[in-house]
């Protein structure tokens, strides 16, 4: 069987031959790098292209992101239902990539037509938001459905065991690595030097290249579908599996919620530009990829559920670390941007500051996905269906997190309460998994009480005490989350150059931006928007305003 398995094969005196999948593993990793690169190029181009139709407000961006991720979620669920496991996974993957490239080119033609339809039917309020969603669905759902189906398709190329499924974490990590490259390539080179049409052609060429390589590999590695095994799931209760789905959904919710909150705060510090967004996204994706690779390695252990629970609990500290660094440390680094001889020098400093803040938490979010896969795996499972469910749960959480934090939490509660909510969500996710682990160990203890202590990471009493201590630390982190400095809202990245701070009469955070009103000792009042002075009561400004 052409499947990924690390179990030795008995072959007498003949040398052991590597299974085809293991032999082609480097090529498969490269395929996922190319797939991720093309996907992020499309995402950046489509966002800019469709914003010309429905606008660039926070609500429009939320609709765009929700449609994009919703399509990927549906694709991950639908492929296992409509594509038989008997089909060669690599051929299915190649067909998906070729179709993505073709649809990517079609979007260039369809979007201008959607623009004429949108402007001809002006609709306001909730109906207008729904109308924008319909237009986004028409443009983005077909290609994003196929994008979401790629990982479940290739998942059938591995065995449904913790060791086999752990390789999916490496595939996921390589896909994210390609996404980082695509993000940087599109944001800093292709769109700057060329235009959206040329950039789309590059992404489509990558898709077609990946499809060609995948098809060639499928001819050299024949596939025989897995033989269904009797279900031996007594120890894997439905409640325990559902707990993993809930936890990975909450993990996706907190990850995208944090990206919304931290993008708002870091944009104050680094400046609101496409380069800042690309830097934040690239650093976040690098950390996710590193975490996914680490999680894939850890997933081979006998306790992936325990590892998942601890990763979620450690996220409470990671979010608290980012909140502290963004509010109390990074804005006050003695850096004067006006002294930089080149924007590229400033970009290097920005990368360092973003990494210091978000890297720890993003690594833990990246590790959670392969750990969740290994936590629900069973010998009788269809690997494609398994990956589809976990991926869908994570994506649904991500969609909810993006919408909830961008439309409700930040505008109405503020970024500080948003970060507190993120810590609480991570704590809840950890407690859900810890409860499932405890129930499973209680069942094991009835049959093999001694094995339970020797095979776990730590004895049960010590593990319980550590979990309680971690929960207490998380609650302390919720209370200790600091407020955003008023000076950061007022002066942004130039805050270190203002040694004498004015009196702040008002500071607020809205759905699109953060604003402040300050009064200097001389009585002059300034109106600040997103770290810049937009108006003042000085006579020379009053004549121009």
State the predicted function of each range:
Residues 2-545:
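Alpha-helical transmembrane segments of multi-pass membrane proteins
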